[in-house]
Amino acid sequence: MAERTAFVERNTLETQVKVSINLDGTGKAKLDIGVPFLEHMLDQIARHGLIDLDIECKGDLHIDDHHTVEDVGITLGQAFAKAVGDKKGMTRYGHSYVPLDEALSRVVIDFSGRPGLQMHVPFTRAVVGNFDVDLFQEFFQGFVNHALVSLHIDNLRGHNTHHQIETVFKAFGRALRMAVELDPRMAGQMPSTKGCL
């Protein structure tokens, strides 16, 4: 089996981002982004998706977290698009429900080649620590646009904002794991009746 890994580097006047991923990893994460709460959430993707992540970002954090969060999402999306390759033999779809105490979230993903985000998370607070939770919309939009996936994110219940966000990221990791899994019955076959994605 060919290695499903990718390295992507993205440099702008606002951020310099490097992302390495291994879709068939063990859930290891090495994160140096400068935004601790985002790092905590990305660690959930690695751990629950069994995807190795190595992400380094130098951003204009003296302004705010916006460019860093968005550009990490963009670059991670580019890395996923590269790592899945032609998608032959891949499950393609993934979904997960994850609870954390009172919170429950559902994430559904399709590596369709068509970007689309539906995100419905009624945050109960605007900020967790120093982190503006609205930036997670920017993260996921950047990811979707560059991974070329359809992504549906729903927080079904919860009143602790940290729990709401954490269930989203854990479910996202688990949905990714399911979607990128290789099915030996589909070896060499495209997971679409169109013959391409």
Swiss-Prot record:
The keyword Amino-acid biosynthesis applies. It catalyses: D-erythro-1-(imidazol-4-yl)glycerol 3-phosphate = 3-(imidazol-4-yl)-2-oxopropyl phosphate + H2O. InterPro entries: IGPD_sf, ImidazoleglycerolP_deHydtase, ImidazoleglycerP_deHydtase_CS, Ribosomal_Su5_D2-typ_SF. Gene3D superfamilies: Imidazole glycerol phosphate dehydratase, domain 1. Coiled coil: none annotated. Its main location: cytoplasm. It is found in: Cytoplasm. Pathway: Amino-acid biosynthesis; L-histidine biosynthesis; L-histidine from 5-phospho-alpha-D-ribose 1-diphosphate: step 6/9. It comes from the Bacteria. Its EC number is 4.2.1.19. One of its GO terms (molecular function) is imidazoleglycerol-phosphate dehydratase activity. Pfam families: IGPD. It is an enzyme of class 4 (lyase). Keywords: Amino-acid biosynthesis, Cytoplasm, Histidine biosynthesis, Lyase. One of its GO terms (biological process) is L-histidine biosynthetic process. GO terms for cellular component: cytoplasm. The keyword Cytoplasm applies. Belongs to the imidazoleglycerol-phosphate dehydratase family. NCBIfam families: PRK00951.1-1 (NF002106), PRK00951.1-5 (NF002109), PRK00951.2-1 (NF002111), PRK00951.2-4 (NF002114). This is Imidazoleglycerol-phosphate dehydratase. It comes from Ectopseudomonas mendocina (strain ymp). The gene is hisB.
